[in-house]
Amino acid sequence: MNSQKGIVGCLLLACTLQMSAQVKTYKYRVNFRDKAETTYALDKPSAYLSERALERRMKQGLPVDSTDIPVCRSYIDMLVGKGAQLVSKSKWNNTVVVQVSDTSVIDKVAALPFVTAVRKVWTAPDSIPARNANRKKEVTNRVTKSNNYYGDAWRQIAVHHGDSLHAAGFRGKGMQIAVIDAGFYNADEISVFKGMDLLGTRDFVNSHSDIYAENYHGMKVLSCMAANKPNVLVGTAPEASYWLLRSEDDDTEQPVEEDYWAEALEFADSVGVDVVNTSLGYYEFDDTTMNYRYRDLDGHYSLMSHSASLAADKGLVLVCSAGNSGRGTWKKITPPGDAENVITVGAADRNLVNADFSSVGNTTDGRVKPDVMAVGVASAVAGNDGTVSHANGTSFASPTLC
């Protein structure tokens, strides 16, 4: 009898564990009505913006405004009190993202008087691939020296007269650049980055992750600017200072990545960077009902584009890739490349012939995009193992202009 009870108990435990494993979690974007209960003030911006950020605005005659005021903490606390977990927040959009496993919590959140909209932006995937715990062992840093100072990057530098700018002293010294991307795989071990002035890193997808173990895309983008190994690989801004910010979740393609990106952009503004490069863009998602349509490319419809359009008001120079959809059915630029006052960069080869994969414009309101073209065919970039490789994409055209 006792053995039977034991068997039943084990079965019940197994069923409970299975049900627990099947519990889905979701993330929702919540729009707030106002910032009425803020504890911050426009006349005391040093409470939420760094001295460097304020100096940048002062030099350009740009005022602090209500979008700079952080999201109301009291509103967030009330969401948490209903059972939601805070994931991210955006003061420019006056939104937060919360995570729940019980969707009835969202009904309670939506009923709050200061909430104007709620939208699901993420559903937990069935599995997440493990990161490479032995990534550092991949790095050999085996390189071949060139007679040219820029190494394999000499063509992409010369096409844009970057060598002339460097000779005149414009090598990025004194400038701060934020790179918002998918991850910076092995950038902490690759020799072309040794000596890079790194101001810091931040992961807006998962604060507990190692950005150097995530996707390699951001590392390759970074190498177009920050590489500084003479006769091997030298980038466009080798003496600049860098923030490495991860907003792309490589495991899924869901709208919440726009929220991560918006928060990363706001962080870059708050710490006082001068230039932001982002070689990311979205128009289709795992849930195809969330895909953008051409009529949405008005510079404001997507959360990313709305945030990007505000960057210039803060004194930021935002440079973004146009996208690589030229050969496909979409063909068009991808948000945030449709935003106003951002520099959207398409790809060309070393002879300045348009790359057929480079996304095209115009925007739905008739603005010409991309704004400029740069080398994005066979671009010299750092490889995952520290060698020098070549890659195609507007992702590498964009940083070549930074």
List each model region and its residues.
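Extracellular S/T/G-rich loop segment that most often corresponds to the catalytic His/Ser-adjacent loop
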Residues: 181, 334-402
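Short acidic, glycine-rich surface-loop motifs adjacent to enzyme active sites
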Residues: 268-298, 321
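Solvent-exposed loop/turn segments at secondary-structure junctions
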Residues: 36-37, 93-94, 105, 124-126, ...
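Autoinhibitory propeptides
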Residues: 76-157, 163-166, 340
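Subtilisin-like serine protease catalytic core
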Residues: 23-25, 117, 153, 163-203, ...
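Catalytic-core regions built around general acid/base machinery
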Residues: 299-315
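Primarily auto-inhibitory N-terminal propeptides
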Residues: 22-85, 104-128
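Bacterial Sec-dependent N-terminal signal peptides
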Residues: 1-24
